[in-house]
């Protein structure tokens, strides 16, 4: 029996982190939902037109223009905004990177904007590269600038939804999903030179780089097409148990974020790969069990 006591301490508002995962999700949803609310139409008025094969794009053309504009702003600020004491266009980790020549340039323009607007005390103080590059400047992976490229990825998800609304036959849906997978994948691969750290715009989740958004969208489109075949066309699988988690992702995220330090979710294991893997599987089982109970009780909490 494990007895757990939770101690609640006052939050120091002078050091409160303002950005975060849920905050970024809400901003991305706000931007994309606002565009969809203003420009969306449910009429398939171009079904018999010569451009019917690409009408999923035509229907979203104003939203495409706005989304690409957001992406253009992101790129312009990332690579053209002058950052005091740093090379223009720098997107490295700072610290020890390149012989300590850019010590406080972590994240380049993205980090500079966050520190300028929010202040050092209100963004993440232990960025991922700190362990390797001994960075000195705080950097927030869910900061202001990266929200623009993240919103573009969110819009690409909306494009997938438009495919299902526009094309009613299996073939039309699959063709469009694979088309978008190939387009986003090809552009993303070209930007990062099909590599992990190279290319014009390397893959970088902390910066939410354009290549990262496009490659992530590519895999998302391919996976959605595969699941559509397995679940909807061939009807070989109903989506369980993942459908349970998919109905309540917000509550599962919050529970994990709150209780991941405590038993029975967390407990000490030796830092051996197979033991850590089993512990991770145990975590998944716990939260899937909670999702299953909520599903059976028809309790669904969403944004």
Q: Which stretches of residues belong to each language-model region?
A:
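Alpha-helical transmembrane segments and their immediate juxtamembrane cytosolic regions
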Residues: 1-303
């Amino acid at each position: 029996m494990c007895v757990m006591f939770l101690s609640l301490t006052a939050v120091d508002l002078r050091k409160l982190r303002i950005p975060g995962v849920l905050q970024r999700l809400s901003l991305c949803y706000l931007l994309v939902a606002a565009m969809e609310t203003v420009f969306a139409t449910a009429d398939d008025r171009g079904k018999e037109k010569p451009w019917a094969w690409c009408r999923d794009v035509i229907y979203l053309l104003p939203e495409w223009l706005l989304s690409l504009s957001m992406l253009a702003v992101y790129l312009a600020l990332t690579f053209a905004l002058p950052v005091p004491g740093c090379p223009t266009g720098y997107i490295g980790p700072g610290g020890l990177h390149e012989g300590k020549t850019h010590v406080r340039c972590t994240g380049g323009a993205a980090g500079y904007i966050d520190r300028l607007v929010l202040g050092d005390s209100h963004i993440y103080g232990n960025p991922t590269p700190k362990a390797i590059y001994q960075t000195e400047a705080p950097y927030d992976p869910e900061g202001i600038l990266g929200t623009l490229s993240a919103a573009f990825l969110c819009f690409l998800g909306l494009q997938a939804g438009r495919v299902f609304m526009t094309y009613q036959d299996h073939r039309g849906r699959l063709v469009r999903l694979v088309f978008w997978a190939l387009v986003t994948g090809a552009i993303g691969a070209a930007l990062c030179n099909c590599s992990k750290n190279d290319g014009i715009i390397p893959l970088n989740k902390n910066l939410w780089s354009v290549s990262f958004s496009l490659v992530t969208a590519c895999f998302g489109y391919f996976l959605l097409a595969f699941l559509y075949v397995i679940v909807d066309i061939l009807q070989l699988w109903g989506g369980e148990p993942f459908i349970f988690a998919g109905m309540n992702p917000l509550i599962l995220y919050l529970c994990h974020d709150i209780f991941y330090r405590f038993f029975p979710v967390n407990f000490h294991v030796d830092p051996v790969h197979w033991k850590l893997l089993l512990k991770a599987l145990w975590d998944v089982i716990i939260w899937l069990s909670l999702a299953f109970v909520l599903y059976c009780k028809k309790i669904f909490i969403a944004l």
